[in-house]
Amino acid sequence: MRVVITGASSGIGEALARYYASPASTLGLISRRNFPYALEGTVVPYAVDVTDAPALERAAADFVARFGPPDLVIANAGVGVGTHSDELADVGKLRRVLEVNLIGLAATLAAFAPAMRSAGRGTLAGIASVAGFRGLAGNGAYCASKAAAITWLESLRTELRGSGVSVVCICPGYIDTPMTRVNRYRMPFLLPPEEAARRIARAIAARRRLAVIPWQMAAVSVLLRVMPGWLYDRLAARAPRKPRDVSI
């Protein structure tokens, strides 16, 4: 199996790489950081920032030329930081979060889509978030980026309908990763990354259009989407906020 994963140096990306690694696998691992672990099979690292579209295009061309179109591409790279939506000083953070979580995701999948479409097979998967269903105080940049990722993946799915290429949107809740370990509040239904990777892989194998992980967060997401605005505003305003002093 030929699998490409972005953000593969830690967290969910590392767990997914470990999950898919086997003596028969070929993994293209894309990250701006070094990989502090070894895997079975053929592993091809690419030191690429997903905000660098030309570099992504070169990495995709190299992988396809050497191994053929991937069976699966997972756009996982992401960043998160607390923001104040009413402060001009935080617009720079918003721009950076959107560049990675939305533009980087779109560029990753678009770099590999033509070869997969020509082959008439494969799966393009994007890691969004439960945070993309409603806006949260102090977390506007992250919520906006994930909401945009959800709708962008939906658009991509409809565009590729009938091509043989599937598009899967994964919306995790809290996963125990370096990104969430900076949070200074209790995170309900927290999953270890290895378990998250297993559940994500199952959803991808089933070609689910949209999968919320874990199931408890799926129930919460349904409630969030139907909750009246007046009630949601009261609850969300009192919710704990992500730290603003995080390097992204």
Map each language-model feature to its residues.
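Conserved glycine-rich cofactor-binding loop
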Residues: 9-10
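Conserved glycine-rich Rossmann-like NAD(P)H-binding loop of the short-chain dehydrogenase/reductase
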Residues: 23-38
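Rossmann-fold cofactor-recognition segment
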Residues: 41-54
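Conserved mid-core segment of classical short-chain dehydrogenase/reductases
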Residues: 80-95, 138
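Active-site helix of classical SDR
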Residues: 109, 145
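Residue(s) in the substrate-gating loop at a strand-loop-helix junction
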Residues: 129
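C-terminal helical subdomain
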Residues: 169, 185-221
